[in-house]
Structures are given as C-alpha cells and as structure tokens.
Amino acid sequence: MGPQNIDLMESMRHVQAGGLPIRAQLRLADETRHHLFTSDLTVSEFLLAKDAKCTPISQVMGSSIFHVGKIADYKGATGEIDTISQAHRDSRRLALSRCFQEAQAIGADAVIGMRIQERLITMGQHGKGGDDGDEVIEFTVFGTAVRAPWITHPPNTPIVTDLNGQDLWALQQDGFEPCGFLFEFCRYHVWHVMKNGFSAGGEVTSAQEAIETARHIVVNKLIQQAGYYKAEFVVGSDVKLTVKEVPCGYKGCDLNDLDVDVSWFGTGVRRIPGWKPHEQAKIPPLILSMVPLGRKRGEIVEGDEDSDELAEKAREAEQEAAEDADDDANE
C-alpha cells in the first residue's frame, strides 16, 4: 500500500485508539527490510554508540497537539492550576507513548538521543488574537531506536532516554544503564502578585514562594517516578523556569497575577545487574627524557660526573619496560 492509498479516516481511528498512524506503520515496516537507517545522532555520538554496543535501527518520533484550557478561568486564588499541569503531563505522555510504540514496532531495546520540542500557542477569544483565550500545546519527541542487549528491560518494552551516544558510552564504562525517562510539569498561579508580599526595594516574596513551591511539587513527583523505575540517580536534567505576568480581570480587577511554569526532564540511571569492573590493560612505564635549557640532546657537558650513571640507569629502565611488555603480550 503506497502513501497515496492511505485511508485517512482509518488512520485517524488507529490514532484515537492509541495506536500509530498507518503512514508511520508503513515507514517503519519499510525501514526494517533493509540495512539503511535514519538517525538524529552526530558522527561522534554514532561512533560512541556503536562502541557501547548500541546498533541503530531507525529514527522514531511521537507528537501530540493538546488543548490545555483557558487561562482567564483561574482567578481569585493562589495555587497550582491542576487542570493545566495535568494537560501538559498528558500531552507529553501521549507524545512519548507514540515514540515508544514506534520503537516497539521495530524491536528496539532503547531510544537514545531523544530531542524534545515544545511549543505553546495562546489563542485569542473568538479568533481575534491576543492572549486572553485558550492554550494549545504542541509537544514533539524524536530519537534513534537502537538494539542494545546489555540494557535491562522487560520484553518488548524499550527504554526511552535523552542521553546521547557519548553519555551512554561513559555510563556503560562505569557499569550503569538508563532505566527510564522522567518528566514533570507544574503551573502555579499567584493572585495579585504586586498587592501582597511586596515592599519598595525588597523581594517580591509571593513570587519567590510560588517559584519554590512549584519546584517542590515537580521534584517530589520526579522522585516518585525515579522510585518506580528503581533509579539510583537522575542525569541529564533539563530544568526550565518561566514566569509570566498575566492580567487578573477578575470582577473588573485591574491588578496583575503571575503564572509560574516549571518543567523538568531527565533520565533515571541504575547499576547494570551483575556488572563487574573490567580489568584495565597494563601500560608499560614511559621514560621521559629531560634536557636542561641550553643543552642539546646527547651533548655531554664537562664536569657532569653523574651523566654517565644517569644514562646507564635510563637504558636499564627502558630494557626492563620492554621485557615487561613482552611478558604481558605472551600471557
């Protein structure tokens, strides 16, 4: 079936049921039939991923466009706007699940080097523009699906991570593996930010408290996610803080409110089960020849009584190093 013959209504039903669009299914099926693959890895990331026993299969992606809600509806109170926070979480979860499904379809062990693009659109009321209407969020993720047998995961459950080839190589060398992608978001609203908690030349305490509270909410939820994946620590954290002043408009009020957005991404990491440190190869000692300033190499200076003795010791050290290297090679 070619792309021109796709039944768009049938494809939409697949998406509504939580599956992949038909076009994506055809693309993935085509890529698994040959050795050519697409990837968003750089040259260095690709080579180090190969060295870390990660074999690229295909580029995978997921996206969602989610209706968040109306900004102007939350007035007269300070606290987290649960409906908006949850809408952001659902949008990201939906995009990640579609990326996950693409990786599943081609038998990947992991998705690495995941890039995240987020765009927030504020639409005016009745199509007139402005920022007094609904919020629509577009969330897109894409990365490279790889086969990596050394990464521990349940059958047909690939690990998704924003770590690139260099990061994976470094973790593997020390016996660690990614175990899950963590993400969290919080929208915290401050009512009448300039009315309370403010003095001339002083800190805007209500705004500062809002930022700290939003961070606290996000961190606590991330800790819960890390516990679910049995992660020992989180790496590659990307924390974004946005503070936006918004008009109150509550019962004709002309004061301003504040919206605080905290977004946090990262990868949970744990020790590879049964991992044992690799023995480092023995490196023969290196001899560093030092030549005093003003003297040429091999030049003998009159009155230097120790020069012959030092030269003899240097030759003996070089001979011992060569013999040790030969012994190691024979072993």
Model-predicted regions and their roles:
Residues G2-I84, Q125-Q208, K244, K251, ...:
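Intrinsic disorder/low-complexity detector
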Residues V60, I65, Y74-Q117, L182, ...:
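Short, well-ordered alpha-helical segments
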Residues E118-G124, L241-C248:
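Beta-rich nucleic-acid/ligand-interaction surfaces
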